[in-house]
């Protein structure tokens, strides 16, 4: 049985600093842009993989130019930075036959384990990245492509378009209000997580069979796969599923309430928790027989929420949290992002990535499981050309200069 790591072995000297993780020794070559694939490969980097971004020097990842200018470098703006820590970067013009030849040579010489892309499918042949072509170069390669709607559909897609298409917006926002997108690009992030799991499964399968794989991730299918309950309830079981704002369709009280100095979210999930809430002096007036069971609370949810609003209005947030938590009632402060970063359960596991040139430090949340890895600062455009082309292909400065003049790298 072969190892899960690639035949390329350990990451070479000078590779981004990272804690040795499960995927140490796995090399990923990623033709990536925007959010979903960069987040997927960021997750792989967090687990120890060597991730090398591939970009066209003349038309790099558009996200490099999005956000605030925090470094005085036009191709290193703020929105690009978070999802690209822990990576290396090269430039390569895959629209030129010589660029395609270099890609194939890199796959062989670096012992690339995973090639990933999130281009539209109509570009595959033009760029020379079709799965059959690259698997012919290295038969145990894992080829991953992320598209909006699958490899047989070339429609352009971005996260909010897919939130609309997948029905997310129908379920998000105030009841009676307009459809609303999430505050996070959940379709991008969800497709990245699904792609990540498929890569890890393919690496395991290859370790047992020696075979490569083609993985096609449809962002639409990824998003709809989360809609298990809404689709089953609405299409098969006769339920009307629609926007509820901060409420829950089946449980009450579940809502946001204003306090004297902020907001709290109260989520009572069963009758025992309701009894615990109404045992508190502040809420004792709500301990009426008609509210004892969840069905009764749902039947008068408007009146119930108005009464709870009165109970919370002159309570301080800290006082509300302390009393309800002590009673075993699920409740949380509605946190600002500053609150989240300061939360002791978060703060002790933040990762900090520093730019060796400017000293700028970026705080990142740690992966959900395991120790926070140490990651390098996001790479400049083509930052590792000399190292990687020299390491893998023996190309010296003069040859690289010639390739730059010809717009190949």
Task: Provide a role label for each language-model segment.
Residues 318, 326-375:
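A glycine-rich dinucleotide-binding beta-alpha-beta segment and adjacent secondary-structure elements
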Residues 192-212, 229-236, 278-286:
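Oxidoreductase and adenylate-handling cofactor-binding alpha/beta cores
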Residues 1-208, 380, 386-409:
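N-terminal helix-loop segment corresponding to the beta1-alpha1 unit
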Residues 51-54, 325-339, 395-400:
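Short, well-structured beta-strand/strand-turn elements
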Residues 252-327, 331, 377:
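Aromatic-enriched alpha-helical interface/lid elements that frame and gate functional surfaces
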């Amino acid at each position: 049985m072969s190892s899960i790591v690639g035949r390329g072995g350990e990451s070479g000297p000078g590779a981004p600093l990272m804690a040795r993780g499960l995927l140490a020794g796995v090399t990923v070559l990623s033709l990536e842009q925007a959010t979903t694939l960069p987040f997927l490969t960021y997750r792989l980097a967090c687990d120890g993989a060597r991730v090398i971004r591939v970009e066209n020097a003349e038309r790099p990842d558009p996200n490099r130019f999005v956000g605030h200018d925090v470094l005085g470098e036009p191709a290193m703006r703020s929105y690009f930075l978070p999802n690209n820590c822990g990576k290396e970067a090269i430039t390569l013009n895959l629209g030129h036959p010589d660029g395609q030849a270099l890609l194939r040579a890199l796959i062989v010489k670096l012992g690339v384990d995973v090639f990933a892309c999130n281009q539209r499918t109509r570009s595959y042949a033009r760029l020379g990245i079709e799965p059959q072509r690259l698997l012919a170069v290295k038969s145990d390669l894992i080829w991953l492509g992320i598209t909006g709607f699958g490899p047989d559909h070339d429609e352009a897609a971005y996260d909010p378009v897919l939130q609309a298409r997948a029905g997310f917006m129908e379920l998000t926002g105030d009841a009676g209000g307009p459809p609303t997108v999430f505050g996070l690009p959940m379709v991008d992030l969800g497709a990245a997580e699904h792609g990540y799991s498929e890569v890890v499964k393919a690496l395991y399968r290859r370790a047992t069979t020696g075979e490569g794989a083609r993985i096609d991730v449809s962002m639409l299918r990824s998003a709809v796969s989360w809609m298990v309950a809404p689709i089953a309830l609405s299409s098969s079981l006769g339920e009307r599923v629609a926007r509820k704002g901060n409420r829950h369709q089946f449980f009450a009280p579940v809502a946001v309430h204003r306090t004297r100095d902020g907001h709290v979210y109260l989520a009572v999930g069963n009758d025992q928790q309701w009894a615990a809430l109404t045992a508190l002096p502040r809420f004792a007036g709500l301990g009426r027989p008609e509210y004892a069971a969840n069905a009764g609370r749902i039947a008068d949810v408007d009146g119930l929420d108005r009464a709870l609003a009165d109970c919370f209005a002159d309570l301080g947030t800290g006082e509300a949290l302390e009393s309800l938590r002590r009673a075993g009632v699920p409740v949380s402060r509605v946190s600002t992002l500053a609150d989240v970063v300061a939360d002791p359960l978060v703060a002790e596991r933040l990762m900090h990535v520093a730019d060796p040139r400017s000293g700028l430090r970026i705080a990142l949340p740690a992966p959900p499981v395991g120790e926070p890895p140490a990651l390098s600062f996001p790479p400049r455009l083509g930052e590792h050309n000399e190292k990687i082309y020299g390491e893998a292909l023996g190309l010296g400065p003069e040859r690289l200069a010639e390739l730059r003049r010809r717009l190949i790298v």
